[in-house]
A protein has these predicted regions:
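Acetyl-CoA-dependent GNAT
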Residues: 1-67, 75-80, 84, 88, ...
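Active-site-proximal loop/turn and secondary-structure-junction residues that shape catalytic pockets
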Residues: 63, 99-101
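Conserved G/P- and acidic residue-centered "switch" motifs that form tight phosphate/ATP-binding loops
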Residues: 72
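Conserved GNAT acetyl-CoA-binding A-motif
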Residues: 85-99
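Conserved catalytic-core motifs of GNAT/GCN5-like acyltransferases
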Residues: 96-99, 111, 115-132
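Helix-turn-helix
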Residues: 106
Length: 141
């Protein structure tokens, strides 16, 4: 589903994070690994504090091996991101995605994990391909 440009972007986030792990607001990662072979990554999520905000974070990437879709790994990753952010006192998580038909399962996933579609920017990526914004409110105690 991801283009080579998208894969390159995701890899650059990893490189940036590990090149300077002491940066003040680093990209953060949650990884799902195989229980028998921890080197085998099943999926991951990348998230971080939205610059110039107080308590808002962005989910940059959440990806699961396509052969494992529907097995609950994405939900576990998403729930762990939400747990970490709540523990940090954050109040909302913002997600951006495409309106293309091949992203329909992704948009349905965000709805299933409690996100709400907040906005659309028409023709953002290209004509007929909107940028869709979802928000997950994070209840903190």
């Amino acid at each position: 589903m991801f283009s080579q440009d998208e894969v390159d972007c995701a890899l650059s986030l990893l490189d940036e994070t590990f090149a300077d792990p002491e940066q003040p607001d680093p990209y953060r990662f949650v990884v799902a690994a195989d229980v028998e072979d921890a080197a085998l990554v099943l999926g991951y999520a990348c998230f971080g504090t939205t610059p110039l905000t107080h308590g808002t974070c962005d989910l940059y990437w959440i990806a699961v091996d396509p052969a494992l879709h529907g097995g609950g790994i994405g939900r576990v990753l998403f729930d762990e991101v939400a747990r970490v952010l709540r523990a940090d006192g954050k109040h909302q998580l913002v997600i951006e995605t495409s309106s293309r038909a091949d992203y329909e399962p992704t948009r349905a996933f965000y709805l299933r994990v409690g996100c709400v579609e907040e906005a659309r920017v028409r023709d953002f990526y290209s004509r007929g391909d909107d940028k869709v914004f979802y928000v997950r409110r994070l209840a903190t105690s």
